[in-house]
Amino acid sequence: MRNSFTLALVIVIATCISAHGQQRNSINSASARADSLQQLVNEAARAALTKFADKKLTESQLSITLIDLRDAQHPATASFRGNERVYPASVVKLFYLVAVHRWLEDKKIQETQELKRAVRDMIVDSSNEATQYVLDVLTQTTGGFELPAKEMEEWQYKRNAVNRYYSALGFTNINVNQKTFCEDAYGRERVSRGPNGENRNKLTTEATARLLSEIVTGRAVNQAHSTQMMELLKRNFIGTSKDNDDQGHGFTGIALAGMDSAKLWSKAGWTSTTRHDAAYVELPNGAKFVLVTFTTDHANEREIIPTVARVVIDAMK
């Protein structure tokens, strides 16, 4: 009896030691993977900063976040200035896209042909007018003449609906409550933005990469809505395009030239002072990653983003 008890105790202790060892090895492996990914992001940043040093590209004008999704259950993330708040241009439309599908899934809004058309144009064509309509639907607010202070306060609370949604999910350091315009905002839209733009949209590459990774792994919304979003984000980077700002050919897709069996999903954004891309890439060898690159004050430098992407792709191939 005593021998049986002793044997059982030895087995239990051995099992605990083995499990502890496996856990420690797993932690060490994850730590090594994270360190390796951080080195890769640092290398990509250095490559861009060195290549464009003569164009006066500085660290303060570049932000990068990379999420390795080769093991989707245990993604690894690394950033270079990933928590810096940057005006996102049309990349903010990615956040409105997810919000629309969440609202639809929760039956807060109804899908109409007009909403479906607007969402498609917002993502595929990056239409600002479509985005304005989408944000109206999401927040039940509209632009127009200035409002009295009390009414404007109520209007602004409603307009912050998308902000509240992402805040509840743990997103921090972002602001997603403004429409995108080809020229400028007027009336209550301008009042909302603030006289000095203090309430402009702001995103970080970390928040953007997190959202895109949740889209591609099906965690943002249900599978049906995830599939619809991925269809809109799919980009063709093969061949050439007459449009330098084509989302497939003018950003991360440049780095995929010659890799016809690779796949790209993305949302780019650009203005006279910014050039950004949020991309999800699948390589022929099975590597999968999200790469978000924001650049400021170098909007006409089409090669900064692909320079970053090439370093990542070469390491992942």
Regions found by a protein language model. Give the residues of each.
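N-terminal leader/targeting segments and the immediately adjacent pre-domain N-terminus
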Residues: 2-5, 11-81, 104-109, 152, ...
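Active-site-proximal beta-strand/loop segments in catalytic clefts of secreted hydrolases
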Residues: 67-70, 123-126, 134-138, 178-180, ...
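Active-site SXXK
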Residues: 87-109, 122, 291
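Short glycine/serine- and small hydrophobic-enriched flexible loop segments
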Residues: 98-106, 136, 210-217, 314
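Extracytoplasmic
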Residues: 57-62, 75, 81-83, 87-91, ...
